Amino acid sequence: MADLELLCIDLQNDFATEGGKCYTYRPSVDFVKNTFIPYVEESGIGINEIVSDYRQPRPGDDRDCCRPGEWGFESLIPLERRKGKQWIKTMNSPIWTRAGAGIPMDNPGLPFQDPVSFGNWLLKQIGGREDVGSVVVFGLTADCCVLAGVQELKWRGYEVSVLSEATDVRSGDQEEKKRFLSGPPFTFWGKAISFEELRKKIGSGR
């Protein structure tokens, strides 16, 4: 059994880098780039990754961003640290995908739910709930796509934590993040873990 697996959600240029279509400054991005990624590179740890394809059409959300083949779609996670194949979602919840997800094309399909394929991706990437001690999630944003991912993992029986320094709420406000990670609804499905706690967990026998 693996002690833990890392899962990054939506750390893409359109969300995380100045000039992105949906960019807001969030301190966690600096932490990931300057502290966390160098740490996992030194430790040789792979990162599982979920990214978004938010091209139109997407009923209920008129944003048009994270377009495959464009800069805004690209992830901040270095290719050499990425573990296996990315899962590409089309809504907040990772069970939503589309025909042509991640493929540069003019007419991508409408979003649809595919929980079976998402579950198969999880099994291939991190194993079943009995194969991994915990899944540590980070990325953007804690109160939207990260929360939706945490819920989906918890409902499938995984133990889930969120790396507090490596996520932010949509506004980027640190007091709001602290409140969000310390109580409901977040604590119904996951718990916050600090970078120091994660380092100790990895050091004690990943």
Q: At which residue positions do the language-model features occur?
A:
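Active-site micro-motifs of SAM-dependent methyltransferase domains
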Residues: 13, 17, 56
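Von Willebrand factor
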Residues: 37-56
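Acidic/histidine-rich helix-loop elements
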Residues: 16-27
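Metal-dependent catalytic neighborhoods of phosphoester/phosphodiester hydrolases
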Residues: 58-63
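A short acidic, glycine/proline-enriched capping/turn motif at secondary-structure boundaries
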Residues: 54-57, 92-94
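Active-site-adjacent betaalpha module
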Residues: 2-5, 12-14, 31-34, 38-43, ...
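A broad, low-specificity signal for short, low-complexity segments enriched in glycine/proline
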Residues: 8-10, 49
